């Protein structure tokens, strides 16, 4: 890329045009329901609009100017150059895949106050065998499970917790199905803040629970579900000076929009036709939609992708809303082994619904056996993910079968969590101890054959080389007969 003048001059021009946006008045908060706009210091402790109880989104001056003929927006080419240049920096803030794009999230009075674990910069994997199984030519996976604490929550937590630290809070808290608590506890520890985690007793994976304890959080298990934990915490933040870090906090979404920037940068600023996202509390879908929309407003991309959201059949309030002719959101009692999306009353459902409607995607659901099969198929690619992530591939196969996604479309799955987040699920699957008879009965003959071929239970043998050799010979002969898809 060629510019007039030397690199220092280009850098000066880029920073000069963005400098005003890095001040404390560079953004406001707008209610997504009634449109009321407030300053950041006027927001309530529960991040709800006092007029309509809606959620806020962060708005910037350049978003308002984008519609005008004389917008004076930052130069898209210069921004791309600047973000690439930061990759060679030794500064922690530049090595972060979130704060490297800080020009598009000026939420701190001083960017040097960012609390970072060098999150982001996650890989974009090619999935050729999964693409073939789904009936499409081109499939990638943006693996957010490769973040420091193993999930996409890190990208949002670095942003929101940095705001909490800069504003002088000592205590932070969240309700969680596991990933949010792990991320919050880690970033709070990094910042020297005290953290409180509320989790539903017996309803999150042990690997996630161990993280919040290891990072020093006060971990409280409540005899309720996730939505019950949210209600308790919402009451507590009104009584004590605790900074709420659930996804109702709009600064979480500012960090969680950055994988959209990373994705198109990794694709040489080309936009895939379709993004498929798992749906739990639904803030991630909303954040990605915001990221793509802002890139289009700034001229970084020419168009936005479709975004489809997939939910577990046992935790599917958005899917039910999507298929309800009256479009009424009705909370459900969530029940799925994909614990990260075991949420029956998602806080960000309206934002996510807007993303589907505005960007032209769909909402689907996947059964427990479909999720388990999809997880095993992704694992067979050498990638791996937690169960909630696999719902994307299960849903993709349905969307292709329905003709909603065509063979030629470029599709990206958002994998939100690492496979080690719920290792017991994986062990139970391969030992054929995960699914019930009723769940297995829902599988087609082809799906049952796939399950049988993908399960790899450990074998226990006598410590005898002849026995081991005979077993290996038998296994190798079978492997030649049953070739992987």
Residue ranges of model-derived segments:
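PLP-dependent amino-acid enzyme catalytic core
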Residues: 20-485
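N-terminal amphipathic/basic-hydrophobic helices that include classical n-h-c signal peptides
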Residues: 1-21
